[in-house]
């Protein structure tokens, strides 16, 4: 079976009966077991295969859910009923969730398959994924480099192709930074957009659960499913959830800003600055409007 980087491509082949969902899950479990980057703490073999068989039954009668067959892994601070969750700390060793996070319930409801839990910095406090009771995570792009953190396992797993989408949590960069380190896409939703129910908290007034994937389309689709008001989280927004997967991606209408003080900072590595400027030119050539903005309080 080939490695998929797009859920749309995977779903097309699944719907064409080129393989079963159970075969797909077994393919990913085997690939996870062969990995040496330590991104996975545990695979949920029994429940994942059970979910896959249910999806296969539904597909046999042409019942399609929005995320049927999407292979998802979750950071080890997100609860999934009956499964282990430790926030990568020995303090919680052996603990099993007594309920599922709202994001997990919504994913499963729409046909996603939760294949396992992912390594992170202990209690999500870190930026290199070296502070875990399960040991450090290696960056699949370069095993001698860190994957970033605290959602390092979430970013590394997607980068290596061990799952199509992962969930991480972000307080001050813990989705965005490891996604950048591992060459994938990570999104921290606006606070209150996604329910925090079932997330082991780090800083409750900043924490947000968000997706990591290989492309914007998969990010949009998952965000569409996990967003929305939740009676179990009083801080969740009651605003209507946009149809993110149908948003207009017309480049000429998109404006991108970057902070000039960051790119001109004396502490910035010259190679990073050069590549950043090349990316700005690339975006401009693609039709985006890219402009600098000032943030003079950066040093404080």
Residue ranges with predicted function:
Residues 1-50, 285-287:
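An N-terminal boundary/leader segment
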Residues 9-16, 91-95, 207-214:
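Short, well-ordered beta-strand elements within core beta-sheets of diverse protein domains
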Residues 21-26, 53, 243-244, 268-294:
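Acyltransferase
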Residues 28, 48, 100, 219, ...:
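Residue-level signal for inorganic ion chemistry
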Residues 55-71, 218, 248-257:
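Immediate post-signal peptide segment of exported/extracytoplasmic ligand-binding proteins
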Residues 66-103:
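Enzymes and membrane/adaptor proteins characterized by extended Gly/Ser/Thr/Asp/Glu-rich
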Residues 100-101, 105-226:
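Short glycine/serine-rich loop segments
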Residues 188-274:
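A short helix-breaking turn/cap at a secondary-structure junction
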């Amino acid at each position: 079976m080939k490695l998929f980087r797009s859920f749309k491509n995977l779903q097309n082949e699944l719907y064409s009966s080129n393989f079963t969902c159970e075969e797909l899950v077994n393919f990913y479990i085997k690939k996870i077991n062969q990995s040496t980057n330590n991104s996975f703490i545990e695979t949920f073999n029994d429940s994942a295969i059970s979910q896959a068989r249910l999806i296969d039954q539904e597909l046999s009668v042409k019942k399609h859910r929005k995320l049927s067959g999407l292979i998802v892994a979750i950071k080890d601070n997100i609860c999934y009923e009956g499964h282990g969750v430790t926030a990568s700390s020995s303090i919680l060793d052996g603990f099993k969730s007594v309920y599922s996070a709202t994001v997990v319930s919504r994913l499963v409801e729409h046909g996603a398959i939760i294949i396992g839990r992912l390594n992170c910095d202990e209690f999500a406090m870190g930026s290199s994924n070296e502070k875990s009771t399960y040991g450090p995570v290696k960056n699949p792009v370069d095993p001698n480099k860190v994957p970033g953190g605290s959602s390092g396992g979430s970013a590394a797993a997607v980068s290596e192709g061990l799952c199509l989408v992962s969930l991480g949590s972000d307080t001050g960069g813990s989705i965005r930074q490891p996604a950048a380190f591992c060459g994938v896409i990570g999104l921290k939703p606006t606070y209150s957009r996604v329910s925090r129910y079932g997330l082991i908290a780090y800083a409750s007034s900043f924490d947000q659960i968000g997706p990591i994937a290989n492309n914007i389309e998969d990010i949009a689709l998952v965000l569409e499913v996990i967003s929305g008001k939740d009676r179990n989280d009083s801080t969740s927004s009651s605003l209507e959830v946009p149809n993110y997967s149908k948003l207009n991606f017309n480049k000429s209408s998109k404006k991108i800003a970057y902070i000039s003080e960051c790119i001109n900072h004396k502490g910035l590595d010259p190679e990073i600055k050069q590549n950043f400027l090349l990316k700005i030119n690339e975006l401009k050539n693609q039709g985006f409007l890219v402009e600098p903005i000032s943030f003079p309080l950066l040093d404080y």
